[in-house]
Amino acid sequence: MPSSSAADPTEILTAPYSEIERTQDERLRHMLALCARGHDYYERKWAGIDIGSIRGVADLERLPLTSKQDLMADPEAFRLRVPDLPLHERALWEVIYTTGSTADPTPVYNTTYDYHAYLFQSRRVAEISGIRETDVIANLFPLTPAPMGAFQRSVTNAYAAGATICAALPGSAHGNFDVHRPLDYAVRTVEVHSASVLWGVPSFLRRVLLRAQELKADFTSVRMCAISGEATTPEMREELRRCLRALKAAGTTVFNRYGSTELGAFAQCREEGDWHNPAPEIQYHEVVDPENGRRLPDGERGMLAVTHLDRRGTVLIRFLVGDVVSLTRAPCPHCGRTSERVVGPVVRGSDLVKVKGMLINPGALVAALAAMPALDEFQVVVRREKESDPYSMDELAVRIACREAPEKLMQEVAARALEITRVRTKVELVEAKEIYDPGRQTKAKRFVDVRK
């Protein structure tokens, strides 16, 4: 069994990277040995590979990559089942679901051991990002049909930081119990509890801040927005800061949390900075070529892969998260921490789409639209010119909602879209709720491709 952390649990974050890697090598050997004994998927996948010959993270290239599709196809096969482990390493604490391309979300199993590890990781995240035990966190994530990581993890992060937490319970109603609450209740929750940290999906946080201005709510206690759950642009984050300034908030810090159900959260030590791995003894990251599994040098962009070094529930080795990033292992110039950092921009591997024969990046158009403060809401749509005809030409459209000068704004949007995509774009004026209704949707869909 690997040794426990040093007396100072954060010491590893400032150690020379060679020391970090030695700890990772030790944890990896133990993790692989457990997988060889009781992990159905990897026992089959690694047939013919001498797992004992893999002595550290430098040898991981000899193991195949694991895709999201592999996990979605048979999530039970990724559960570690070693019956002679201590009870806390075997006992199921919780099941959290991650979204996928199928109708049903994919379960990720956490034992008591894993939950404690997440508390440990979350304490580090709080320290790096500046969340304090005196903070009051307003959980503005939606209450969803399946227990999703964002909502569930808000309270865990509060526990880890020693902070107070309250929840607004927004989201689309489902089932027989009337427990979901409207947008105005979210505003009231922040005001009544004098919340200092707003925790949620950025598109919904923006709606809360705009509604707070309309209601003249007291948000002077707010000092930070901690956002995750959907991709954001620098322009969107600046829009959140603008709203905070308009409300005379105590602070305008916007931390963009990066992570997933499978890997937990990374943390920024400063706004718009890189994302620190807060627990290098728990997980290892590499950037790879997804076609051949080859590890790419630090600084080169490729697909992010995570390897669990110390888990007991769902265990993933060389798991492709789905994001294109780069890594650096140089000491952080701002805080001096030495664990690896994810360097943006973070681009989903599936973000490039072909429209009328042109390969475009919808994210670039979304970023440009987010920088237009006159837009209350917007959505980029790729569809067929004739919905009933699957062979008709592609059409790129932008649906917008605004309150003033719609004709002029529509012309500006069309010109900006053409400049970015080189594809002529149709602009449609609609009601804001047709694009994003906080009472029915968990987050805004800024880009949709509805072609059949």
Can you say where each PLM-predicted feature lies in the sequence?
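Conserved beta-strand termini and adjacent loop/short-helix elements that scaffold enzyme active sites
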Residues: 168-170, 257, 288, 383, ...
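Conserved AMP-binding/adenylate-forming
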Residues: 232-331
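Nucleotide 5′-phosphate-binding alpha/beta core
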Residues: 1-97, 103-128, 132, 192-194, ...
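Short glycine-biased active-site loop of nucleotidyltransferases that positions the nucleotide triphosphate
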Residues: 147, 275, 389-390
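AMP-binding adenylation
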Residues: 1-26, 30-33, 212-215, 292-294, ...
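Conserved residues at the C-terminal ends of beta-strands
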Residues: 201, 228, 307, 328, ...
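Short, well-ordered beta-strand segments
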Residues: 136-140, 305, 399
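Active-site phosphate/ATP/adenylate-binding loop shared across adenylate-forming ligases
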Residues: 2-10, 69-251, 255, 263, ...
